[in-house]
């Protein structure tokens, strides 16, 4: 199931209900790809005017677990060069050096996407790959 760029256009109660409905209709073992902005703190302080509520990493991860999803993978998507610079400046020397080398080889448009992948909590956008456990009934 693909669920992308939608949950942020709903009130958080409705977004949570939509996730429950996804869980209900998924077959056991099925996966869902869920992407959305990552906005820690007050989700009503949105990055984009068209959005109603933007879930933060911890909040969304907890809600997915509460519903019953198993998290298969978490991926950071899209971040700005400035944010990546700030983030990597605080890391261990080897990681800082790796980032500095990558900046010299990779165009900024690709760098921001590539370097955000392993750090979903810090990324501007999230991709959660979740699964309905194989032992669950279809109408759980």
Task: Name the predicted role of every residue range.
Residues 1-43, 61, 128-132:
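Conserved SAM-binding loop
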Residues 12, 54, 120-121:
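Short, solvent-exposed loop/helix junctions and linker helices
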Residues 13, 58, 93-96:
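Generic alpha-helical secondary structure signal
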Residues 37-42, 54, 77-80:
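Short "lid" loop at the C-terminus of a central beta-strand within the Rossmann-like core
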Residues 44-59:
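Acceptor-substrate binding/catalytic loop of class I
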Residues 60-78, 105:
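A SAM-dependent methyltransferase catalytic signature shared across enzymes that methylate proteins
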Residues 76-140:
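A C-terminal cap/extension of S-adenosyl-L-methionine-dependent methyltransferases
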């Amino acid at each position: 199931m693909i669920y992308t760029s939608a949950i942020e256009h709903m009130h958080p109660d409705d977004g949570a209900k939509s996730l429950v409905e996804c869980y209900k209709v998924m077959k056991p073992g099925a996966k869902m790809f869920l992407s959305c902005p990552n906005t820690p703190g007050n989700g009503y302080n949105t990055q984009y005017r068209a959005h109603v509520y933007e879930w933060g990493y911890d909040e969304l991860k907890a809600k997915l677990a509460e519903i019953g999803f198993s998290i298969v993978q978490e991926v950071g998507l899209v971040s700005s060069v400035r944010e990546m610079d700030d983030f990597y400046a605080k890391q261990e020397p080897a990681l800082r050096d790796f980032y500095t080398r990558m900046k010299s080889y990779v165009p900024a448009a690709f760098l921001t996407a590539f370097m955000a992948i392993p750090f979903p909590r810090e990324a501007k956008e999230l991709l959660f790959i979740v699964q309905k456990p194989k032992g669950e009934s279809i109408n759980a």
